[in-house]
Design a protein with these regions (language model features):
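Walker B catalytic acidic pair
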Residues: 197-199
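General structural signal for alpha-helix termini and helix-helix connectors
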Residues: 25-32, 50, 54-58, 74-81
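Conserved NTPase motor "head" modules and their coupling/switch loops across ABC/AAA+ ATPases, GTPases
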Residues: 58-193, 202-206, 210-221, 230-235, ...
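Short regulatory helix/loop adjacent to the ATP-binding pocket of P-loop NTPases
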Residues: 25, 229-242
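Extended, charged alpha-helical "arm/stalk" segments used for dimerization and assembly
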Residues: 1-51
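Conserved D-loop beta-strand region of ABC ATPase nucleotide-binding domains
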Residues: 225
Length: 250
């Protein structure tokens, strides 16, 4: 299931952790190994951070960090490699879809910035070693996949959210969700059930039609909620259900 909601623009203009969680959920839908890596990484990170706090008062346990750093490096390296692979794949859809939906000649691309300078396991261990004193002082792990950032750029390598209007952000968020649908089909060869919860009303007729046409062309099962049937009057064949006072009728 891929759902479109009115507040989806947060994946365009939200904080780094919000956008990172979006891509974590997306990759997890198509890659079971990624879910396992992410789950392991979070447990390792939690234990490492707890140990860092304890070391402030018990310096004699500092050697225990070597064990956690080794596990952390293995997991972090694998996560970064997968994220790079999937964002490259995702961009092949996103660039095209945004142009087709919006009609703008804006060449959008999503860049992934890993806080680790190199995903090689040995290099990750070396980076952790260099940051060890800082990590101990702060009581937390200051680099790794939990600090990674995804940024959307437009023409002339300008950050998209710095100039995008509300409408452009809405279209970009829809383009991201449609890219998600395409990625899932490309990898798993399964059609998504697509849910659109009152996201079409903000679009003009041309762009609303573009979105619906993309979904129709993909032959997906689509469920749309909207305040007015005019939002979907471009579609010829659909089942119309009306909800009045919590009662559903055709």
């Amino acid at each position: 299931v891929v759902a479109f909601f009115p507040d989806d623009t947060v994946i365009i203009s939200g904080t780094p952790d919000v956008i990172r969680r979006y891509f974590d959920r997306l990759i997890s839908k198509v890659d079971k190994e990624y879910i396992e890596l992410l789950t392991s990484f979070r447990k390792i990170l939690k234990n490492r951070n707890r140990l860092l706090k304890d070391i402030l008062y018990k310096r004699d346990i500092i050697k225990q960090l070597d064990i956690w750093d080794s596990m952390y490096s293995d997991c972090a390296s694998a996560l970064v490699i997968k994220r790079k692979q999937y964002i490259e794949h995702f961009n092949t859809y996103f660039k095209t879809l945004y142009k087709e939906l919006s009609g703008f000649n804006d060449d959008l691309t999503i860049k992934y910035y890993a806080s680790l300078h190199n995903e090689n396991v040995t290099d990750v261990k070396n980076e952790l070693s260099k940051k060890r004193n800082i990590d101990i002082q702060m009581g937390t792990t200051t680099l790794g996949p939990h600090r990674d950032v995804y940024v959307i750029y437009g023409n002339e390598n300008t950050m998209f959210k710095s100039y995008a209007s509300t409408g452009q952000r809405r279209l970009a968020s829809i383009a991201m969700k449609l890219s998600e649908v395409s990625l899932i089909y490309d990898i798993k060869k399964s059609k998504s059930i697509v849910l659109l919860d009152d996201v079409l009303s903000e679009l003009d007729d041309d762009r609303r039609k573009n979105v619906l046409q993309k979904l129709i062309d993909g032959n997906h099962q689509v469920i749309i909620t909207c305040a007015s049937s005019n939002d979907v009057n471009f579609v010829d064949n659909y089942k119309h259900l009306q909800v009045v006072h919590n009662r559903v009728s055709e």
